[in-house]
């Protein structure tokens, strides 16, 4: 569906234009919003595909792929690998490990909604290529369905957090 939409440039990056006020940020693009550089790199595998129906509740192209990473690395190189904000669906591997350690150190079981997401996926392995080179001030993700903040990393679920950088 998204691939059928027209592609245009908006705020310095390529987007799919959905309507006059709604845009889909293409994976791997860097945008300048409010004077801040933002890398958009959404996508993740559904961990519960067996309960979903293809083309209705899950899609094969929902996961990050090699071309998304190539696009991100190419766009990052144009800004010396520096952005203010990274927006992803899946968290970087380092942050995911820290969240799990935090639950363990508190004597809590890892929440059931995180359990299926513990194994590294193909998207997470690909994302490591970006993790190695990008320099950023804050990184936001939402896949773990928990509200947690550790250093420069944010996992958001219910919270809305203003970007103050």
Predicted regions span which residues?
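Active-site-proximal loop/helix segment associated with metal-binding centers of metalloenzymes
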Residues: 13-16, 20, 29, 33-122
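Conserved beta-sheet core of the metallophosphoesterase superfamily
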Residues: 3-4, 8-20, 95-165
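Conserved acidic residues
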Residues: 28-29, 143
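Short acidic-hydrophobic, aromatic-tinged amphipathic segments that line or gate anion-handling sites
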Residues: 24-26
């Amino acid at each position: 569906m998204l691939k059928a939409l027209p592609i245009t440039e908006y705020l310095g990056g390529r987007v799919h234009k959905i309507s006059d006020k709604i845009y889909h940020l293409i994976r791997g693009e860097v945008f300048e919003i409010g004077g801040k550089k933002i890398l958009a790199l959404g996508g993740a595998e559904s961990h519960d595909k067996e309960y979903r129906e293809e083309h209705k509740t899950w899609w094969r192209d929902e996961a990050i792929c090699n071309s998304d990473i190539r696009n991100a690395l190419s766009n990052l190189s144009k800004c010396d690998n520096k952005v203010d904000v990274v927006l992803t669906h899946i968290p970087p591997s380092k942050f995911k490990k820290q969240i799990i350690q935090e639950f363990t150190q508190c004597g809590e079981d890892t929440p059931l909604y995180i359990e299926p997401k513990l194994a590294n996926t193909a998207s997470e392995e690909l994302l490591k290529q970006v993790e190695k080179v990008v320099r950023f001030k804050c990184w936001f993700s939402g896949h773990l369905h928990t509200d947690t903040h550790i250093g420069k990393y944010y996992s958001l679920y219910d919270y809305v957090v203003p970007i103050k950088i």
